[in-house]
Swiss-Prot record:
The keyword RNA-binding applies. Belongs to the universal ribosomal protein uL4 family. One of the primary rRNA binding proteins, this protein initially binds near the 5'-end of the 23S rRNA. It is important during the early stages of 50S assembly. It makes multiple contacts with different domains of the 23S rRNA in the assembled 50S subunit and ribosome. Pfam families: Ribosomal_L4 (PF00573). The keyword Ribosomal protein applies. It comes from Leptothrix cholodnii (strain ATCC 51168 / LMG 8142 / SP-6) (Leptothrix discophora (strain SP-6)). InterPro entries: Ribosomal_uL4, Ribosomal_uL4-like, Ribosomal_uL4_dom_sf. This is Large ribosomal subunit protein uL4. PANTHER family: 50S RIBOSOMAL PROTEIN L4, LARGE RIBOSOMAL SUBUNIT PROTEIN UL4M. The lineage of its organism: Bacteria, Pseudomonadati, Pseudomonadota, Betaproteobacteria, Burkholderiales.
Amino acid sequence: MQLELLNEQGQATAKVDAPDTVFARDYNESLIHQIVVAYQANARQGTRAQKDREQVHHSTKKPFRQKGTGRARAGMTSSPLWRGGGRIFPNSPDENFTQKVNKKMYRAGMASIFSQLAREGRLAVIDSITLDAPKTKLLAAKLKAMNLDHVLVIADEVDENLFLASRNLANVLVVEPRYADPLSLVFYKKILVTKAAIDKLQEMFA
């Protein structure tokens, strides 16, 4: 597979050979869906909590006598059948949403995403991306010159200048290959990869 090599003006100046094992795999929609959903599920935190009938603070006194009232029998007001009572199946902050994806499937899914991005023309290569100072406007100017406004940059090494400059750009994410995730790959309109990062991606996902 050959990918376009962009200059600092966003023009394709040459072609770069990329490993077919990562950038020319068959499109596997179900596997991609699985690893994206698993990534989102594993990022979830237990932020919901409700009380069951044991946890609500109600009297345990029987609200009315068992027989003779014509009403349905009731033992306590904390019953889930009563207004203000506990939930039958309450949400718990200890709930585990983890979904396991084995390494072989994850590598295959990531390679399938990279391959589809290459086929759609959303993946491009640049020699390197460096900044002289940690200034957001410097990085914004570089990306604007390449006509990139919604982009994931995968650099072989993210130095402090590049990291600090990218933090304040809403639609720009700069990561090293080891931090590339399936959700970001499918979310961003354009993926910009440095030449040195291609070798690292091959080691990880081939």
